Amino acid sequence: MNALIQSKVQCKKPELSETKCFKMHIGKDKLNCSNLEVNGKVMKTTNSEKYLGDVLSSSGKNDENVQMRYEKGMGIINSIMSILKEISFGQHYFEIGMLLRTSMLVNGILFNLEALNNLSVAQINLLEECDKILMRRMFDAQQGTPIEAFYLETSVWPLRHILMARKLMYYWTIIHKSESELVKEVFNAQRDFPTEGSWLSEVQGVLQSCNINYTVDQISKMSQAKFKNIVKERIQSKVLVYLVTLQNKHTKSENLHLDSKMQPYLRTEVLSLSEKKLLFSLRTKMLRLKANFSSMFGNILTCSVCKEVNSIETEFHLLNCSFIKKDKVLVNEMQQVAYEDVFSDIAKQTKVVKVFKKIMTIFDKQKTLGEKQNEK
């Protein structure tokens, strides 16, 4: 073995030394391991080593890699938000935001993960935490905003489903590789000698869950475009089931639905960026009102400004609040809208969000004044 290593060194002429070369043992039995050498010196033994940006571990675990991707993702989020704040994208703010999410965050933290196996649920959740943070910052959303709301409104896939699609497309790529390539030889070995926990067994599980029941021979005869369309269609169905499952656990997102495109109000030129963010808060019932955060206010939900008995501080109440109605100009506008308009067409959404914008200005001002008086 040492002679082979030395031969490779002489042929390739790389700058190798004992500081650059390590040996890593995989498995439990170390009795038959030889002492490998490079340039006449014994290689050092290591349990983990960074190679081409990823950490190779003797345990086969992905903890270090996932943690590195998470930390990288946090840096990418700051870069994306800097771009969105420093450059005025007008009505295209959210569209550009989703493009930056895909090109920078998704590609940055999911790069080559389709080739890894045994990613745990906890590890996938950690990577998705980056996505959640980006979404919240992009929408200026409260911490408790249901995560499915972001995906339903923007019509993008959660990271776990993007990773599924990438694994399946990598599966197609391997099938179409030459039999002489190393990756194809490994693939064939995993197919001929099935092992629980192997990359192929994991992909087969994804295929089954997506109801893609084609054989290797059938897939080998498919074009990339055809297989990609099949994958996209099946993953889209899984995304819908996943988001609806989450939605059923949260009443705040119950009126939202998944569309083929981003919601029109996020793309329109009629609304300003602040109005779009306000409309999102209205649609997800995440305005800073007592009824939306009842536990935070000890279930004391009386309106902070009118303080009427039996009044409950909700979006519905604000449209009928006696204190807000003291503004005689605004009261006429309030009578022309309903809370349900936030789920209607652009025309009605525009009217209702502009009314709520004025309402919240009065509400916040009076609430702040009341809090200062209470402090005295």
Predicted regions, residues:
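Basic, alpha-helical interaction scaffolds
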Residues: 40-117, 173, 181
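Structural motif
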Residues: 42-46, 87-104, 145, 153, ...
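Classical protein tyrosine phosphatase
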Residues: 2-15, 322-330
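Acidic catalytic cores of enzymes that act on phosphate-bearing nucleotides/polynucleotides
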Residues: 123-126, 130-131, 136-281
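Family-specific functional microsites
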Residues: 83, 87-90, 246-376
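Short, conserved micro-motifs composed of acidic
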Residues: 3, 7, 14-47, 68
